[in-house]
């Protein structure tokens, strides 16, 4: 059939050449000044003329700050990004240490195992490897896998196909010795076997409250020489500091400072700086904040490459290899299935950030050890889905070129470099750990984070926001008792709220706060919807009455069995009925009375209401203080 028969005139083919389509081409180009004026209009709407904000003041109000002082502005522009983006796989490695070639296995799905039951762990390891796991992370400790059981738990593993990494919180030497011994007994050629010993004597000392001993590093590196060049003796574990409360800047800076000190130590022990770089890996944290995680991984590679340049390391050896592990500090005990979402975001962030291996913690990590394969399956499948279905692994540095991510990478790198230099002035990371420097930085971060958690500027879904009393949990095995440590204390972010919940569940009947909802649902619905979840954070039940006379409200209060009440309504109803109901509830025996709203909404009765009412519920309130004091009033033991 001819082209004419098919309906296409050969003379018209020139009209089919592709053209660039500009989606915004029909609109006038907006200047930055016009954008700024529009921002001013929005933020000044309703403000009196004498209180109008300038653009700089508007920007300040819209800017947020991380716990360690990184500014995040509402909009980034071309001038905020570097002029040259660079390329993945080449110095300074900001965009990736390696080049992803389109294969789906762009990173190792590295499964964590720490169950001391060697038979359970052996079976779990085999099931994981048969179902998508590509490498292993084993905790070898008195409360985890015993060194003498390592041979058994790895007995089904094809060591020539599976990299194994160990780490320990109590005896790194014993863990390393146990792993090397397993590999030395293998009948496979040593050069085909890759293993990571997970040594980090500085982080170990910080965790245990002891003095770092770097003198053994060289011996371990030499012992690994017979194995695959992919083997590593050192894993700088920034996760140790993250779990103790470090922000992104400190976690990054202290990893760099630790690495620099290890390079110096290994050079003194007879290695070149390039050989030292070859034996160092990083373990970094992936959190619920995807952009900070992506930027931190990128910034670490860039800064580590700069350190390599100073040490004279071969350019192609300066890339930082990173094992990202999802944040233990982010994991919650209440409503644990929400942790699957947190783990998904963190794993996504690590993959976009260019981690070579990713460990997704089981969503039960705050409850106990997995009782069966289900939590382990969800953890490994998170990475597999992202790699094989979402296809992130087919893309090199997908966040590269983003004005926001590029600017955030630069901000983190600059701030971390400044802290790195402070540590260097102290004499290195060993000195920083042994002095008060690390604890002072951690105390500042933890204090700021505690404020944000308490006022919910840093909300925790299903815990401090949208809590569900009696949410479905999952059966786990209890964690074995761990030996005491004298070093850095670890705390999950949700612990402060879980302590409140524990107080409520420790009594035979849940404590109650009566919601006195005045007027119609149109009047009280918004306040009731805000206040009820606040009380539920601590596991406090909220019986309520919807409208009615003062006498009916008091009668409902008495029947509820509550000893504390919370007024919920609109300004209009507060002005009409609020004071009367407040007085009646106090007369009926309310030990404490709260107001959802503002005292000024009582109109002429505002001053009297403020004297009568014990506290308020409002956006930005310290929910931890209010809930704790309410439980005190109700006589619930701490």
UniProtKB/Swiss-Prot annotation:
Cofactor(s) it depends on: adenosylcob(III)alamin
PROSITE patterns recorded: METMALONYL_COA_MUTASE
Pathway: Metabolic intermediate metabolism; propanoyl-CoA degradation; succinyl-CoA from propanoyl-CoA: step 3/3
InterPro entries hit by this protein: Cbl-dep_enz_cat (IPR016176), Cobalamin-bd_sf (IPR036724), Me-malonyl-CoA_mutase_sm_su_N (IPR024067), MeMalonylCoA_mutase_a/b_cat (IPR006099), MMCoA_mutase_b (IPR004608)
Entry keyword set: Cobalamin, Cobalt, Isomerase
Keyword Isomerase tagged: yes
Pfam families: MM_CoA_mutase
Catalytic activity: (R)-methylmalonyl-CoA = succinyl-CoA
GO terms (BP aspect): lactate fermentation to propionate and acetate; propionate metabolic process, methylmalonyl pathway
Disulphide-bonded residues: none
Broad EC category: isomerase
Chain positions covered by the region annotation Disordered: 1-34
UniProt-listed Enzyme Commission number(s): 5.4.99.2
UniProt GO MF annotations: cobalamin binding; metal ion binding; methylmalonyl-CoA mutase activity
Polar residues compositional bias, start-end: 1-11
GO annotation, cellular component aspect: cytoplasm
Purpose of the protein: Catalyzes the isomerization of succinyl-CoA to methylmalonyl-CoA during synthesis of propionate from tricarboxylic acid-cycle intermediates.
Family: Belongs to the methylmalonyl-CoA mutase family.
Quaternary structure note: Heterodimer of an alpha and a beta chain.
Protein name: Methylmalonyl-CoA mutase small subunit
Originating organism: Propionibacterium freudenreichii subsp. shermanii
Gene name in the database record: mutA
